[in-house]
Amino acid sequence: MKRILILIAAVAYLSGCGKIIDWVPVTFQIRVQDALGNDLLDPANDNRWLAGTTIRFRGIVVDLDETGITSPITRDMSVTYEGFRLEKGEDYYFLAFGQFEGATDYDEESFVIYWPDKTYNVITYDRRINTRKGGAKEVWKLDGVKCTSPIIIVR
């Protein structure tokens, strides 16, 4: 009887499931404003200067899509590449790029935004996954200086 109990306990212990984490896909958000804090991406503020903006990631150059997302918002957590686009948030407009796998470490990944006036900004992203704690440590840099997300570019 004792052997059977030990066997049942061993089977229950060894067949237990580990911690399952649904990692949220990463989307890069970039706000653009002037020195006074005015949203330069808002169509009401004449954002025609955006035409011709591109982003380069891993050698691939993607043009800005100013029409926004047309796909429905769902609760699905799968990664869907949605390109480089202009989106409207709660209180402001922003440029979004992605989505990228949330369960992946990123080591100093660089994104270069090329503006129509021939200037550019370099965004660097570093991410370390900690499966034990169920979180990730993210470091964002704008032109080499640490910043927060969403990234705010002053033009």
Regions found by a protein language model. Give the residues of each.
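Short amphipathic, basic-aromatic surface patches that mediate peripheral association
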Residues: 32-46
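Short coil-to-beta strand junction motifs in C2/discoidin
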Residues: 24, 43-52
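C-terminal motif of bacterial Sec signal peptides marking the signal peptidase cleavage site
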Residues: 13-16
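Extracytoplasmic cysteine-anchoring/structural motifs
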Residues: 18-22, 26, 31, 57-155
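Positively charged n-region of N-terminal signal peptides that target proteins for export
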Residues: 1-4
